[in-house]
Every structure is written in C-alpha cells, then in structure tokens.
Amino acid sequence: MALRLDDKKAVVAEVAAVAARAHSAVAAEYRGLSVSALTQLRKEARESGVYLRVVKNTLARKAVEGTGFECMQDGLVGPLILAFSLEDPGSAARVVSAFAKTNDKLVVKLVAVGGKQYGPSELERLASLPNREQAISMLMGTMKAPIEKFVRTLAEPHAKFVRTLAAVRDQKQAA
C-alpha cells in the first residue's frame, strides 16, 4: 500500500521525534520473519520501552537527518526494522539481541550510539550495559564499601577485646 505525501511526512516527523530523544538505535534485517514472530518482537519492545518501527529506507534517512543517528543513513538498505532505546542506552540492544538468539532470521545490521555507528559485533557489548537502576546500585555499592570497611576497622579492637575476655572466662571456668 502506497503512502500519500501527508502520511509520509507524518511518519518522518514521528520517527524524527523519537530519534531526537533516543539514547541508541539498532537496525536489523527482518527478511523471512513470520508475522507472529514480528508481533512477539513488538510486544517485547513495548514492554522494555523500546520504539520499534518498520519504515521505508528513504523515509528513515530523512527522519534521522539532523539527529544523533545521522551516521546510520548510508547503512539503511534492505528490509530493516528500527529500534530506538528511549529509557536507557542498552534496552533496544537487549531486546533485539535476545530475540535474535531465538530467531536466526533477524540479522542486526547497524548499531548507533552517541552519533557514532558501530557494527553488529558491538550489539552484545551495548546489551550488557546496565540499566539506570543497576548503574545506581553499582555506584552506591562502590560508595558504601569504604565506609563499611572503616566502621569494621573501628569496631575490631573492641571486638578483639571482648573475644579475649571470653577466652579468659572460658579458661577459668574450665579450670
């Protein structure tokens, strides 16, 4: 079904708005995937806060123009599905990577983060990035560790004294 000019402008505007606020993007070839598989991929993407859309390549090129994903323009060839991470940089990569493990017909072609394009080999690296909550908990653990060690160091002489008294008491009771 051919799109009218107004529809094309609306698609370009929608994808451009999403691309402008996205952290990262993944373009994958979906040739040979069944409708049910694509529906499952869309469901997983929705649950993860990932914008997933099949867009004509010419419209996608116009949509990413002037955004941080302009670097992807040359690689937008063939039947591609675009995934944009809206919540954290690795969410689109996690969704596409997990789905590609079970469906070999979904082939990652491009990965873009921070205005730079990477090859498909970088998908796993991006997918392994922690999300916001995980990053905060890792940071808090790192910040908390020196304080805990300091408190244990301060408490150790008192604990050692108590253990010594207990050993003397046990020795006297045994005698």
From Swiss-Prot:
A Pfam family the protein falls into: Ribosomal_L10
GO MF annotation, one: structural constituent of ribosome
InterPro entries: Ribosomal_uL10, Ribosomal_uL10-like_sf, Ribosomal_uL10_bac, Ribosomal_uL10_bac_type, Ribosomal_uL10_CS_bac
GO biological processes: translation
GO cellular component: large ribosomal subunit
Alphabetized UniProt keyword annotations: Ribonucleoprotein, Ribosomal protein, RNA-binding, rRNA-binding
Function: Forms part of the ribosomal stalk, playing a central role in the interaction of the ribosome with GTP-bound translation factors.
Family: Belongs to the universal ribosomal protein uL10 family.
Subunit structure and binding partners: Part of the ribosomal stalk of the 50S ribosomal subunit. The N-terminus interacts with L11 and the large rRNA to form the base of the stalk. The C-terminus forms an elongated spine to which L12 dimers bind in a sequential fashion forming a multimeric L10(L12)X complex.
Protein name (record): Large ribosomal subunit protein uL10
Gene (name only): rplJ
